[in-house]
């Protein structure tokens, strides 16, 4: 029985699905795509610290406990590829097993760097441990979502019942930095429309929240700290929680209007012959209560649709061997 690590290394969070070639999923979890740089002290031993490329880091939620100036936001591709091995390492340590196969993805907007990204996670060293993986596969982000939609529709882990398999729809995967848009005709992904757009993801909401906090509280926070405010609905400063839910609601509404306008302006011809628009990714959670009958979103597991698809792809690779 082979072990499959499906890992969606996003700019906002790292989503993980881990399972076996018998179709059993063992782990499903996520952690924030952020690191904090720290120094070393021979008298202080902290097991949370990881050594990577001659520097010491805290990763994910451990990093978010540190001051903003210690954080490195993963908002640019150069940081994503640099720290990708560290995120893979963190996932492996949380799982407690070494996978036989790794399946991950990149936005269509960045697929020109796919070889370099694949090589980065094929072989690396963290905490004096060497990792080498022979079976590493890289898919476009939207492709992962599409595989999941085909199998589960809107209701993972329940097998889909409502789609005929011959639907025409526009799929939109909303990430932290990028959005990936793809066209499905008669149940199959079409090369006619498969596009990734940078700097149009949930990061735009985080930027607005960061700007509000700077203006209102005179505090500079990182985009990942702003994402935490977005997720929780409040800003915590020196032990006091400030309710920002109404501010966040307004920012979300503006973003969603801009997003739908972007899709309409760029892909109106494809929309004309589509039955609906399927939104996935973390950003789709903001539209799950939409009254628009033409918009569909997952009932749950919004952020995991790419990672689930990556796992399903990994299953097919072992079945073919």
Sequence positions of predicted segments:
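Nucleotide/phosphate-binding catalytic cleft detector across ATP-hydrolyzing
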Residues: 1-169, 188-202, 216, 224-321
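Long, charge-rich alpha-helical interaction segments
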Residues: 207-215
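A cytosolic small-molecule/anion-sensing beta-strand core signal
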Residues: 185
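Active-site-proximal alpha-helical scaffolds that flank and shape metal-associated catalytic sites
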Residues: 172-176
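A structural feature that tracks compact, well-ordered secondary-structure segments
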Residues: 180-182
């Amino acid at each position: 029985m082979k072990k499959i690590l499906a890992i969606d290394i996003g700019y906002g969070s790292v989503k993980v699905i881990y399972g076996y070639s018998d179709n059993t999923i063992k782990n499903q979890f996520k952690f924030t795509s952020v690191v904090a740089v720290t120094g070393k002290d021979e008298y202080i031993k902290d097991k949370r610290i990881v050594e990577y490329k001659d520097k010491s880091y805290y990763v994910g939620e451990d990093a978010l406990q540190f001051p903003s100036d210690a954080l490195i936001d993963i908002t640019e591709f150069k940081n994503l590829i640099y720290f990708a091995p560290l995120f893979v390492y963190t996932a492996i340590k949380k799982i407690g097993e070494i996978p036989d196969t790794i399946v991950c993805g990149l936005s269509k907007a960045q697929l020109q760097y796919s070889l370099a990204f694949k090589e980065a996670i094929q072989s690396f060293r963290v905490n004096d441990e060497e990792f080498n993986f022979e079976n590493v596969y890289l898919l476009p982000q939207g492709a992962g979502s599409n595989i999941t939609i085909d199998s589960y529709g809107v209701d993972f882990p329940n097998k889909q019942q409502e789609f005929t398999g011959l639907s025409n729809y526009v799929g939109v995967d909303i990430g932290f930095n990028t959005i990936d848009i793809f066209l499905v005709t008669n149940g199959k992904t079409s090369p006619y429309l498969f596009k990734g757009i940078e700097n149009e993801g949930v990061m735009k909401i985080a930027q607005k929240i960061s700007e509000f906090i700077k203006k209102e509280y005179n505090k500079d926070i990182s985009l990942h700290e702003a994402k935490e405010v977005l997720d929780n609905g409040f800003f915590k400063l020196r032990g006091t929680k400030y309710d920002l839910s109404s501010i966040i609601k307004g920012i979300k509404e503006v973003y969603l209007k801009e997003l739908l306008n972007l899709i309409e302006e760029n892909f109106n011809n494809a929309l004309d012959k589509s039955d609906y628009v399927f939104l996935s990714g973390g950003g789709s959670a903001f539209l799950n209560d939409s009254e628009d009958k033409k918009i569909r979103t997952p009932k749950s597991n919004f952020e995991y649709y790419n990672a689930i698809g990556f796992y399903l792809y990994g299953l097919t690779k072992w079945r073919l061997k």
